[in-house]
Amino acid sequence: MVESTTSLVKLEQDGGLFLPPGFRFHPTDAEVILSYLLQKLLNPSFTSLPIGEVDLNKCEPWDLPSKAKMGEKEWYFFSHKDMKYPTGMRTNRATKEGYWKATGKDREIFRQPAAVNTSSYGGSSNKKKQLVGMKKTLVFYMGRAPKGTKTNWVMHEFRLHANLHNHHPNLRLNPKDEWVVCKVFHKKQGDEAINNQQQQPQYAAVDQYSAETPNSGSSVVQAGDIDGGDDFFQLDDIIDPSIYFVSNSSNILSAPPNNNNAVYSVSASTTTTNTTAVSFQQQPNYYSLINKSSSSSSSNYSAPLQQHVSSWNITPGAGGAHGIGSSYYNLQQQQAAMVKALENVIAVPNFGTLLPSSNKLKGLSKSAMAGLTQQNPLGVPQYKIENYGDHYISRQ
C-alpha cells in the first residue's frame, strides 16, 4: 500500500515543512525554474511549502538558515530583485555587513524534451532541449568593494529566460520588477583547499645536456619557484663546457676526458679514441686564458698558456650530428686569427719548446707525430701544427 502525499508531508505548528527521515528537498535546476519560479511570475500570490520569501539586502547569509522553511545544508528563497539606481539596470547586492559578488559565467538551464515513443511510427523524436532559464553564481564578501574579504557563503540565483514567452503569453518579464529563486549554502573549508593540497614537488631542475642540440650561445634554465620567485642561471656557470657525444654501442650520454690541463710533449705518444659516432672536441677557453695571463707578470706568459696548448689543435669533426659540415669555419685560420688578436693582451707566446718547427719534426717517430695530431677525428685532414712553430719562432 502506497501512502498518499498528504500523509507524507506534514506542517509543523510554526509553519515549517516536515519530511520523514530520508526525504530531502533537492530539485534540479529545471525544476526550480518550471515548478516554482515560473509559477511565482505567473501568479505573484503563489506560495510554496519548501521555498519562503526573503529580502536578501536586509539579511546576512548566516541569518538565512533560520528564515528558511526547510533545509539542512542548502536553503531556497524567493527574492525580489532590487535595483541599485532607479534609472539603472544594476542589481543592488549589498547588505549591512558586506555584499554579494558575481563570479564566473552564467549557466544556461534547459528543459529536457518529453520522452515520446516513436517506435510505432517508425521514426525518432526530433525535439530539442528548450532554454528556460539562467543560473548565476555569487560569493559573499565582508566589507565594501573592492577591498572585501571573501567568505565561504555561496548563492545560486535562478532567473527565467525570455524564451518562455512563446509558451506563456500571459508572462510579463520586467527586469526592474523580477522575482528570482536563490539557493544559499555554506561551502566547506576543505572544498576550497582541495586544489591547494595537491602540491607539486619544488626543486631546481636542470635539463639534461643533450647531444642532439648544438652548444651555441648561452643556455638559460629556469629554476623551481622555491622562494616565491623565478630564478634564472646560466648553464655555463654550472656545467663543464666539455661537449658530449653519443656512443652507438651503448646509447649512453657520456663525455670525453677533460684534456685542458694536459701538455703534450713532442716525444710522447697518445692513444687515439675511435668511436663509430661523430665526436665533438673542445675548443680553447679564451676567457680563462686572458684572465690567467693578465693576472700574471708580463715577463712570464708560457706557464698559463701551457695549460691550454693541448686545445689549440682540438677542432670539431666535420659533418657531425649538430649540423656542422663544409660550411663550418676554417678553424685553423680562426685559431691563428685569435692569437693575433690577443697578442696585445697576452703578448706573443713562445711555442718554440712546445710546437717545434718543421725542420725539427722531420726526425720524429710516427708515435711522436701521432701525439701532435691525436685529437683529429676520422675524416678530417691533419692540421699542420708545425706552421705554428715556424710562425712564432721566426718572430722571436
Swiss-Prot record:
Intrachain S-S bonds: none
Location, primary (coarse class): nucleus
Superkingdom of origin: Eukaryota
Protein's UniProt keywords contain Zinc: no
Matching InterPro entries: NAC-dom, NAC_dom_sf
One Pfam family of this chain: NAM
One Gene Ontology biological process: regulation of DNA-templated transcription
Induction conditions: Induced by salt and cold stresses.
Intracellular or extracellular location(s): Nucleus
Transmembrane segments: none
UniProt note on tissues of expression: Expressed in phloem.
Any one GO MF annotation of this record: sequence-specific DNA binding
Residue ranges constituting the NAC domain according to the UniProt record: 19-187
GO cellular component: nucleus
Keyword terms, alphabetized: DNA-binding, Nucleus, Stress response, Transcription, Transcription regulation
Described purpose of this protein according to its UniProt entry: Probable transcription factor involved in stress response. Binds to DNA-specific sequences of CLPD1 and OAT promoters in vitro.
Domain statement: The NAC domain includes a DNA binding domain and a dimerization domain.
Descriptive protein name: NAC domain-containing protein 77
Organism encoding this protein: Oryza sativa subsp. japonica (Rice)
Gene that produces this protein: NAC077
